[in-house]
Amino acid sequence: MDQIFNKVGSYWLGQKANKQFDSVGNDLNSVSTSIEGGTKWLVNKIKGKMQKPLPELLKEYDLPIGIFPGDATNYEFDEETKKLTVLIPSICEVGYKDSSVLKFTTTVTGHLEKGKLTDVEGIKTKVMIWVKVTSISTDASKVYFTAGMKKSRSRDAYEVQRNGLRVDKF
């Protein structure tokens, strides 16, 4: 009789423990979906999901690695919707070797596809005045910025990451 109670008790405790572990896993998943930025990165790391570095992701999608400032290392990328959110520590301007300048706010979002970033929010470029960039696309030798009108620039100017200079406002 003791053996039967032991087996039933062990089975019952095992079932309870599995439910508790499943509950903890579900809690981690719900926490992960309800928080932003670096915290989400940390939760994903705890869960075992490691993100590739931002330059690697950009290269995979055929975009130059220097489009974003060098200190833009935290990002979120939804594989299903292709939404990219890049977190930048402070509003900054980045100058490139072709003398172009981009200004970044602390959160840049867009829709990432092979060779292009569309529906961009959070980037401006200087064309006599600061103009909002709405899309970035590439081919073998050029990067095309759409900011009211489409403007092409030499791709090699954006192949090296550069640091941004902190500015007061976007």
Swiss-Prot record:
It comes from the Eukaryota. Pfam families: DUF538. SUPFAM superfamilies: At5g01610-like. InterPro entries: At5g01610-like, DUF538. Gene3D superfamilies: At5g01610-like. This is Uncharacterized protein At5g01610. It comes from Arabidopsis thaliana (Mouse-ear cress). The lineage of its organism: Eukaryota, Viridiplantae, Streptophyta, Embryophyta, Tracheophyta.
